[in-house]
Swiss-Prot record:
Annotated compartments: Cytoplasm
Transferase is among the record's keywords: yes
Reactions listed under catalytic activity: Mo-molybdopterin + GTP + H(+) = Mo-molybdopterin guanine dinucleotide + diphosphate
GO biological process entries: Mo-molybdopterin cofactor biosynthetic process
Record-listed Mg(2+) binding positions: D100
Protein name as it appears in the record: Probable molybdenum cofactor guanylyltransferase
Amino acid sequence: MSKWAGIVLAGGMSSRFGEPKALASWQGSTFIEHILKLMTSALQEVVVISHSHIKERVEQLVQVPVIEDIPHYKGNGPLAGIVSGMEYIEADWYAIMPCDAPNVSHEWFTILLEQTSNNYDAVVPIINGRKQPLLAAYHNRVKEKIYALLQEEKRSMGQLLSQCNVKYIAGEDIQANADWFINVNTKEEYVQAQKDLSNE
């Protein structure tokens, strides 16, 4: 069993963005390719959770498995995506990554891995006072908790965290750059992220 695996969440509808964010251009490739390049350099196995509308297009771009949510839980947000990835790859710990945080660094996965221990169910960063449950790590044992929540039609990451023994890590304590955690939700944020990139 590989100890560490990565799950990239690319199944959202990107309604505020106006087109699939996973396929947005970034540094000569796309968000999804850029994020996978970083993750595959740090983790043994990675799977992408995609929406049926873009699955084939994503498969053409990447060299890792691309799957959809488990049919019974399809459309139940990030929890469904996470548990689908956990079922697909057997591992002890899973690093979760949304497809719309293109500033993330390879370094982040190294930091995250170092923070895990069997005493905890999850490791979640707190950046500028906000929890970041989708740029976090979850132990395999969380899978049963997710299934229980989905059975009760509960979909929020907060509900999962409330049932887990979570190690919260403050960004400033672990030398994490707040920019790594910036989500691109709108075209305006996308334009700004590209400007910031060209100014570096």
